Design a protein with these regions (language model features):
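Amphipathic alpha-helical dimerization/coiled-coil segments
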Residues: 1-2, 24, 76-104
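N-terminal helix-turn-helix DNA-binding core of bacterial DNA-binding proteins
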Residues: 2-43, 65-77, 81
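Alpha-helical residues within the helix-turn-helix
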Residues: 35, 46, 52-53
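Beta-hairpin "wing" of winged helix-turn-helix
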Residues: 52-63, 69
Length: 104
């Protein structure tokens, strides 16, 4: 299941940091990403591979470089499937609480 891969990828703080870096500046090379991480290139590459497997990051070759781009679609799908329904429920509970407190 694709959502399982997304949750696994998001479960690591380094991978979340990589996604944050790509949100700030999309299309970075491995070297550019490693400048902001305290780890070896090989470790960063392994994290990027997990993000690619979850379809959260895609790469494009430009000459000898690989550029890494964030793919927001899986994050949006997780939001729609898992977060949004709880958000609606929370808003409904807050509305009911407001009505109760205001004596309506």
């Amino acid at each position: 299941m694709q959502a399982d891969k997304v949750f696994k990828a998001l479960g690591d703080p380094t991978r979340r940091k990589l996604l944050d870096l790509l949100c700030e500046t999309n299309g970075q090379t491995l070297g550019q990403l490693c400048e902001n991480l305290d780890m070896a290139r090989q470790s960063a590459t392994q994290h990027l591979e997990i993000l690619e497997t979850a379809n959260l990051v895609s790469t494009v070759r430009r000459g000898r470089e690989k550029l890494h781009f964030i793919n927001p679609v899986p994050l949006h799908e997780v939001y729609e499937r898992w977060v949004r329904k709880f958000e609606r429920q929370r808003l409904s509970l807050l509305h009911d609480l407001k009505k109760e407190l205001e004596g309506e």
